[in-house]
Amino acid sequence: MTTDWNFEATYLELRDIFYDRGPIHPVDNPTLVLFNDALAASLGLDAQSLKQDIDLLAGNRQTETSFSQAYAGHQFGNLTMLGDGRALMLGEHVTPNGKRVDVQLKGSGPTEYSRGGDGRAALGPMVREFIISEAMHALGIPTNRALAVIQTGEAIMRQGPKHGAILTRVASSHLRVGTFQFAAGAGSIDDVIALTEVAIKRHDPDLIDAPNRYEQFLGRVVERQARLIANWQLVGFIHGVMNTDNMFISGEGLDYGPCAFMDTYHPETVFSSIDREGRYAYANQPYIGSWNLARLAETLLPLLGETKEEAVDVANKQLTRYTELYKEAYFTGLAHKIGLFVRKDGDDELTDELLRLMMETEADYTNTFRSLTLGEIESLPFATRKDGKVWLGAWRKRLNGQGLPDEDVSRIMRQYNPAVIPRNHHVEKAIQAAERGDFGPTEAILTILRDPYNYDQSSEYVSAGPPRTYPYQTFCGT
C-alpha cells in the first residue's frame, strides 16, 4: 500500500480552451468528517496517511496536474456554455495496477467558469452525494464515488448560512457529452477529433487503431448509457437533472444533487424542485438518455462520414440501437426481479401488468419486489384485488414452469432486488444530523447501504416504508 498519489494529466494534452489552471483558494480550518477507507484501498492508497494530511483534499495544496474543465450543457433543453464553476481536478491518479481515475474536489472555490458564484459547496449536499454514490456502487450500478468530505470551517450563504464543505470525487473520467458540445461550439473540428482520441484512449483503448473508431466509439457510449439508465429504472432511481453536462462518456452516473429513489411507484414521479415541467421524471429518463446521445452524435458528425448524409446515416445507425439495447436490459432485469430467468413471450406483458397494479394501489416500489422475493404475498396492496389475484396466479404459473424450487427462485431474486435503498426520509435525517455536527447517522446508514442485497439485516432502514405526510422535494444545493 502506497501513501503517495500518482497524478498524471492526459487531459492537458488538449488545447487550453478545454481547461483553466487558475489559483487555488485555501480554507483556514479544514476538518475531515467523512472518509471512504475501502475506496482508498482500491486506489492503492493508505487511508491513515490520507486522513492525517488533509491539505490536498481541502484544496489547500495545488498539484502540478490540477485544472478546471470547460464544457457546455443542454440544461432543461437549453444549450449553455458552462465549466467547473466550483471544482478542481487534482489530476488523473494511476493506481498500482494501472487503472486511471480522475480525482476532483467539488466546492474548492471559484474558477474561470464560476459565473459570479462563490465556488463553494454546502455540507448537506456533499453528504448526500457521499451517501448516494456509495449506495449506487453497492447496488452494482456504475457511478463516480466519494473519497472524502472536508468541512471547511467557513459559512456560505444558501438561503441562509450553511456549513461549507469540499467533496473529493473519484471517477473513471469527467468527460461528458457537454465536453464534446463545448469542443464543437467553441473549438474546431480538430478539437473534436483531439477530444475524441483522448476519450477513446481513456475508455475504449481497443478501438485506437480501428479504421471506423469514431463510429464504434459512439456505439460504445450508446451501449453504456442504455445499460446505465436501465439499471436506474430497475431500482427506482430518479436522477433529477439529466442535462448533457451530467452524462459521462464512461457510462457512470454523476451529480447526485437533486436525485432520489422512488418510494410509492408512479412513472411520473419527479423530485427535483427545479424540474417544474417534469422533463426528467422517472418515465422520461430513457427518452432523455436517447436525446442526450443525439446531441453527442451531432458533435461527431464531421468524423463519421465524407458527406453530411453519410455521417447522419452512420450516427442514426448507432442511435437507433439505444432503444433496443435499453429495452433488452430493462425488460430482462424486470423479469429477473420477479424470478423469471429465461425470458419468454408474454413476460413483458406480465411485468407491465404488475407495474399497473403497483401504480393503481400506490405500492412501494422496492418493498413490492422485496415481498415477492420473500413470498410475503399478503403484504402486497393489490393481493386481495380481483385483478391482483389474476396476476399472482399467472405469475405463479410462470414460475412453476421454470421447474426451479421456490427457495432457489427466492435466492436468485435476492441478487436483483435490494432489501434496502437510500430512503429519502432516512437520508434527510442523516444530513440534518451532520449539519448539527453528528455524523453517526450518516455512518450508520452507509453501513446498511453498502450491503443492500443482505436480507438478513435487522434495521429500520430495511423494511420501514416512507412517511406519507408530505411530498418529497430535492434541491441541487448549488
UniProtKB/Swiss-Prot annotation:
The active site is at D245. It catalyses: L-seryl-[protein] + ATP = 3-O-(5'-adenylyl)-L-seryl-[protein] + diphosphate; L-threonyl-[protein] + ATP = 3-O-(5'-adenylyl)-L-threonyl-[protein] + diphosphate; L-tyrosyl-[protein] + ATP = O-(5'-adenylyl)-L-tyrosyl-[protein] + diphosphate; L-histidyl-[protein] + UTP = N(tele)-(5'-uridylyl)-L-histidyl-[protein] + diphosphate. Its EC number is 2.7.7.-, 2.7.7.108. Signal peptide: none annotated. Coiled coil: none annotated. The keyword Manganese applies. The keyword Transferase applies. Mg(2+) binds at N246, D255. One of its GO terms (molecular function) is ATP binding. Pfam families: SelO. Its cofactor is Mg(2+); Mn(2+). ATP binds at G83, G85, R86, K106, D118, G119, R169, R176, D255. Keywords: ATP-binding, Magnesium, Manganese, Metal-binding, Nucleotide-binding, Nucleotidyltransferase, Transferase. It comes from the Bacteria. Nucleotidyltransferase involved in the post-translational modification of proteins. It can catalyze the addition of adenosine monophosphate (AMP) or uridine monophosphate (UMP) to a protein, resulting in modifications known as AMPylation and UMPylation. HAMAP family: YdiU_SelO. Belongs to the SELO family. This is Protein nucleotidyltransferase YdiU. It comes from Exiguobacterium sp. (strain ATCC BAA-1283 / AT1b).
